[in-house]
Amino acid sequence: MAATTTILSSAAPTPLTAPPRARARAPAARRRRLRARDILGAALGLANGGASAALAAPLSYEETLRLSTDSGGGGGGGGGGEFALPDLGLGGVLDFVAQNPLAAAAGVAAVALPLVLAQVLGGASKPYGVVSAAAAYRALVEEPGAQLVDIRPPGDARQSGAPDLREAKKKAAAVPYDGEDKNGFLKKLSLRFKDPENTTLVILDKFDGNSELVAELVTANGYKAAFAVKDGAEGRRGWLSSSLPWTAPKKGFSLSDLIGDGTDGLPVTLGLAAATGLGILAYTEIETVLQFLGSAAIVQLVASKLIYAEDRKRTLKQIDDFFNKKVAPKELVDEIKEIGQALLPSTGTKSQPAITEAAPATAEAAPAAATATAAPPAAPVEETSTEAAPAEPTPLSPYTNYPDLKPPSSPSPLAPAEATKNESESESAATESAPAVNSAPVAEAAPEAAPPAAPRPLSPYPNYPDLKPPSSPSPSAP
């Protein structure tokens, strides 16, 4: 050990070995190239991580001795020279690169290539990844921008339940993932989360099925970050196995299952159910609905017609005209008819009491006239029966009222003496028959009423047998 110490501390040869043969001093440029080569080899060995053991091997005793001798300040008698690092200047590096360009390029590539590969193959942090269930729950509680997305099918979520995020004052967004409809999935997410650049999503699946794939998909479409829960909801190290808060499934009917989590997509079934319920309610309570509608119409009419002065005057005038011109006349006519029917007897009941009252008066005045007028009470029955029959058409010609269609001849004028005699006879007859005036017309009205005449045909042919008129006589020969 003492000999070794003397060798390291002094450049003089040991007495056990022969002194080295004197060599010519190498040029300074050659020494610098050697030093640059040694340093470059050491750098390449460090960069490659020990791939080239020969370049990174330690210096031997002779090489160390030679370097210490070269770095000494004089010839062989120089004493007290210490080992110093090689002085590599900028000029020496430039000279080496100029003389050995291939070696310099290889050295630079060997140093830069590992750094480039580290950046490309995963040196930078990715915005998506896989985390444990406990870490995911902690992120949901601590980070305001973290949201839980449940991508399980709706049937699995209803059967097993969902995570309970009441501690974080949040709610899991149930958005089922379908690998064949990625655009629809992203659209549903955009409806739920309006600020994707500041939103971190925690993806929960039943197991590790599609959670990591969805995390990569959402980060590629503008979300800040996304992390898949390890083993999902029901895995060995998933959410349930980690004893994290969990909401048990609901056994009864729930409107939230029909409506869903999104407020923008109301299912069609809920709309149909609401329409059906409203229809049944309106059908069963139709009277109440009509009353309500009528009340609403009256309120609207009063509000629109009576608020302003001009509308109020016009409305009151219309109401007055309605009651005076449309409603009142009809009611007045109906009331007059009812009063007339109550006070005035009918036609059939009016004739019979008049006959019964007139019969005693005629019996007291003239017994002979009473016997003559005993039969007339049956006459009104005949009149009522004839009135009930349909009316015959009245002929237009007066000749039908005469037998054989022959009117009577005009009377010849009488002498003045005969005229005065006839007038006196008529006056005496009128005075004699005065007491029976009240009863005689009623008795004589029935026999004088002639039956209605048959309608007169417009053609003369019905007057001939077999509708054949007689032939015209042929003229005789002269």
Swiss-Prot record:
Transit peptide: 1-21, 22-58
Region Disordered, residue ranges: 1-29, 344-478
Principal location: plastid
Annotated Pro residues bias: 405-414, 449-478
Cellular component terms (Gene Ontology): chloroplast thylakoid membrane protein complex
Cross-referenced InterPro entries: Rhodanese-like_dom, Rhodanese-like_dom_sf, STR4-like
Keywords: Chloroplast, Membrane, Plastid, Thylakoid, Transit peptide, Transmembrane, Transmembrane helix
Segments of skewed composition (Low complexity): 11-21, 353-391, 427-448
Positions of transmembrane segments: 102-122, 266-286, 289-309
Membrane topology per record: Multi-pass membrane protein
Residue span, Rhodanese domain: 142-248
Claim: Plastid is one of the keywords in the record: yes
Compartments, record wording: Plastid, Chloroplast thylakoid membrane
Subunit (UniProt): Component of high molecular weight thylakoid LFNRs-containing protein complexes containing LIR1, LFNR1, LFNR2, TIC62 and TROL proteins.
PANTHER family registered for this protein in UniProt: RHODANESE-LIKE DOMAIN-CONTAINING PROTEIN 4, CHLOROPLASTIC
Protein task: Rhodanese domain-containing protein required for anchoring ferredoxin--NADP reductase to the thylakoid membranes and sustaining efficient linear electron flow (LEF).
Name recorded for this polypeptide: Protein THYLAKOID RHODANESE-LIKE, chloroplastic
Source organism: Oryza sativa subsp. japonica
